[in-house]
Amino acid sequence: MYNIQKVRDDFPILSRTVYDRPLVYLDNAATTQKPLCVLDAMRDEYLNVNANVHRGVHYLSQQATDLHEAARETVRRFINAPKTEEIIFTRGTTESINLVVSSFCEEFMGEGDEVIVSVMEHHSNIVPWQLQAAKRGIALKVIPIDDSGNLLMDEYEKLFSDRTKIVSVAHVSNTLGTVNPVKDIVRIAHEHGVPVMVDGAQSTPHFKVDVQDLDCDFFAFSGHTIYGPTGVGVLYGKEEWLDRLPPYQGGGEMIESVSFERTVFERLPFKFEAGTPDYVATHGLATALNYVSALGMDNIAAHERELTAYCMEQMQTIPGIRLFGTTPDKDAVVSFLVGDIHHLDMGTLLDRLGIAVRTGHHCAQPVMDRLGVQGVVRASFALYNTKEEIDALVSGVKRVAMMF
């Protein structure tokens, strides 16, 4: 296990105060704080290396290109992808999903074809499919959950038909913390000859991800939820699928040749990377991945699982508490309500105590409907959080509850 105080020292923002109280940052599912090494790496590139990548013969351009492509290799190693050509840089999980949805539907889906998603999906894995449903007449089928937040796998198997073209599911629910059985989801889909896309925005920061072990066909995640910068994300796709998909956007960098008669597209991964990439952000992402790798993903997972279990246990000492997502196989998220206190009131008053949590539907309105609530308070944990911060949260919730 790593030294938690030394880790916290790596994150300058954690030492600040809010309303004259120490900051207790428990909104990590929305975004994580950044270690100094990431901030320094990005600043150094802008100061000393800044030049457009892939397009210059001069020294700075070649140096920036080397950093950018080294970042791609770092990502490949981090998720154990077979080839760097299967790593596509995007602006985040949302764009990664939209890329697959748009290109896959254009090539493989028509009226009456079906996609399977789950009721716990983030809107970024619902709305793009609905846009295609309106355009092409495809249909969404939905995997239900039980009251603890587990997918009903027997019902999942029943959703397949000869019109099912793809399955697209979250690895970890951003609202419930449920860790979904992705390997089983993939195995069942492949038995039906159907590919699977996995939204890994809430799994990649918390435990080791091996896309070859999962055997998923596409995997998406963001930089900002794993201690890297905003505006950068990753799409992994199996080469045999990426080769078959048309480009998502057109522009510079993704072409081999252009005339007014035709365009020949670049090889992978550049076919899907139109325009100037955020090459400083990719360097920042690689630095973040190296940082968590040095701490050890197994160590991070153990620490966060311990925090989650402790928080769930302590929350049950609060009169009137309602916990959402109570499956034992959950990670780094505790969502709750207390009595009739509105989630916005709870979040606002906790903020006055220096405690940052997220309130609302968390871009997951369908699962809110399933739970029968308009919104919840969500505390979400990271590698730098402590049991003392959990104690502060529980104490704060009790204090707020006494006001009502």
Q: What would you call each of these model-derived segments?
A:
Residues 1-404:
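Pyridoxal 5′-phosphate
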